[in-house]
Amino acid sequence: MRRAAILAGEVVQSTIGLLKPGIREFEVGAEIEYQMRKRGASGPAFETIVAFGERAALPHARPTAKRLGKNELVVLDLGAILGHYCSDITRTVYMGRAPKRIRIWYGAVLEAQAAAIAAAKSGAACGDVDAAARQVLAGYRLDHLFVHSTGHGLGLEVHEDPRVARGQKKRLEPGNVITIEPGVYSAGIGGIRIEDDVAVHAGRTEVLTRAPRNLIEI
């Protein structure tokens, strides 16, 4: 799984380097799959999510013919299958100079992710990991814009137990691999999501995906 996660991080970074005004979502999606296979993946772990501008407000947006414009958010959510194991990573970038509101929102999501990763220890209830992310976003008055769970299990399938969601009492165990993917979404503005794969070990956690998490402005 570590290799699949590293591969996904490499692909998302190479894809960000290709973004430019006028490129279409489905062109980016096709490039992502090409880059995966070029690096040895047997294919994508799920249908790649590519969303520009207002469409980034859709957490599960599929690539369309929409062209990338200036001053738009870009959400890239992708995963690869390598050695039968799945990975899952999301990064959000901004085409242009991000306005203050986007910077604040991005910082809040990044802080929420860090809090959830810190909470994702062996023995922790999955609902408490989810709550850690929501508590941070509530501090920014953004929790109402977080419309999905914080994460899910990952392995031979892209969605497995445990669910990192509200009220989940199941406790994390060494050997679990989960995603941590808080996000905020607003119609007319777009969305911001940051996702990484986290392995739970006895006494520590390990982030398997390797790609910069800072706000990238193109």
Regions found by a protein language model. Name each.
Residues 1-218:
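Active-site neighborhoods and metal-handling regions in enzymes and metal-associated proteins
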